[in-house]
Amino acid sequence: MATSGVEKSSKKKTEKKLAAREEAKLLAGFMGVMNNMRKQRTLCDVILMVQERKIPAHRVVLAAASHFFNLMFTTNMLESKSFEVELKDAEPDIIEQLVEFAYTARISVNSNNVQSLLDAANQYQIEPVKKMCVDFLKEQVDASNCLGISVLAECLDCPELKSTADDFIHQHFTEVYKTDEFLQLDVKRVTHLLSQDTLTVRAEDQVYDAAVRWLKYDEPNRQPFMVDILAKVRFPLISKNFLSKTVQAEPLIQDNPECLKMVISGMRYHLLSPEDREELAGGTRPRRKKHDYRIALFGGSQPQSCRYFNPKDYSWTDIRCPFEKRRDAACVFWDNVVYILGGSQLFPIKRMDCYNVVKDSWYSKLGPPTPRDSLAACAAEGKIYTSGGSEVGNSALYLFECYDTRTESWHTKPSMLTQRCSHGMVEANGLIYVCGGSLGNNVSGRVLSSCEVYDPATETWTELCSMIEPRKNHGLVFVKDKIFAVGGQNGLGGLDNVEYYDIKLNEWKMVSPMPWRGVTVKCAAVGSVIYVLAGFQGVGRLGHILEYNTETDKWVANSKVRAFPVTSCLICVVDTCGANEETLET
């Protein structure tokens, strides 16, 4: 039988691998013999003098491994003709290891020798060892050593290592500034660090805290630098409450007129209109926001069942939840607060319950002007939008309302093009998208496939391409320029199919279906992954959570993590950053 082309190609690859292994084995054997000759001082033509130790070697081997020795032995330098070559300011053990590496291509890098090895490899220009040390240190970077590693990398001209250390410093600044390494930095490095836009913080008060900690660590000697250091704090970004109660009361600030001016400037910023604030720059440029995203689920018909789901470790934690039960309500998250609105018991609930995730506190505000259930809600630019829904037992509504979180006031906006309830609504790139739903909560209420978008700038609605599948009680999430409609039900029953709306193309496309069919789906997205955390099938609820990777179009049923037990729950993504930290603000 003739051998196929694929088999021939595979055979050639195998033969090449075997030949390469044999060559490597022979080379290792030759070098092993040379290393033994070195140890026995056979044919050695140079002795490296390191303090009191004499290390024999062959010039050609050292020159091949090190650009430093190559230049030394091949130019007219004095050492090129000397049998003994003195290496000043070198450690004997480290030089011994580098010479051994030149013969064996093997070296042990560990936490005890890495700094000395890196210094020597850099000085004697042995790039493979330098790379091994850099790779080792990159894996060791943490809050306690990142500043020192950054300084070391700068001194030894290791840009890749410095970049890794600096990225860690910026991303974990709230941990780094509480370490001894930070307190011992010189003024130049602290000033540079506090000026970075890429510092990842919950709020600017943490940058202020870092500056004050550094100044107070050696107050008598650091007093002259106080204005330069505090000038890097962006006081307009600090809350008015923290400025007045904490910053102004700080003795360092009170005793320095220049610093007091900075604080007063920050206070004045809070008195400006949004338009006037936009004209300012520099001191009002935001830092990189620190995030800790979790998915919050509130019990709905079982209010005591409220939990966070952490997508990092797949853990569930309880949320203290005192409010009464609500059927068919909605919830959204904005600026540390979850807003729970709409829904009904026997009658529509007028009150809006609010939960501050950082302070773990509940309070109530006036709810939507038109109390109703089966509505949808989302947040954008400090405003909470509610759409559609139905007053108990009635048809779906065209209604569209807006709550301004700054003025704490409700406003009625232009109605939707289509009446709908039990629909989905998301914010994407500043626009409000509404998809699906039904014309009423009764059996005869037609399920919709229609979609529309609202532009807050022009206060106008525009009809969009309809979904492929009519659906209500579905999940609707926004991920990277795509809006995903997940499950739900049509006029015949539960759905397992999933489709997404391409915002740029104005078209819907089907993707892989869920490994479960549900008439009600409760899902949310963190990063590129959609998590289905609760749902109802008609005769039973979702048992374990489902995950959908939007980049690979793959579903995973996680059999190790139980789903949320309440199918009528409310769901939203929240940022809990700061919830478990020491609170600076009083």
UniProtKB/Swiss-Prot annotation:
GO terms for cellular component: Cul3-RING ubiquitin ligase complex; cytoplasm; cytosol; nucleolus; nucleoplasm; perinuclear region of cytoplasm; plasma membrane. Pathway: Protein modification; protein ubiquitination. Kelch repeats lie at residues 294-336, 337-382, 383-430, 431-481, 483-528, 530-575. Residues 146-248 form the BACK domain. It is found in: Nucleus; Cytoplasm. SMART domains: BACK, BTB, Kelch. Its main location: nucleus. Keywords: Cytoplasm, Kelch repeat, Nucleus, Repeat, Ubl conjugation pathway. Substrate-specific adapter of a BCR (BTB-CUL3-RBX1) E3 ubiquitin ligase complex. The BCR(KLHL7) complex acts by mediating ubiquitination and subsequent degradation of substrate proteins. Probably mediates 'Lys-48'-linked ubiquitination. This is Kelch-like protein 7. The lineage of its organism: Eukaryota, Metazoa, Chordata, Craniata, Vertebrata.
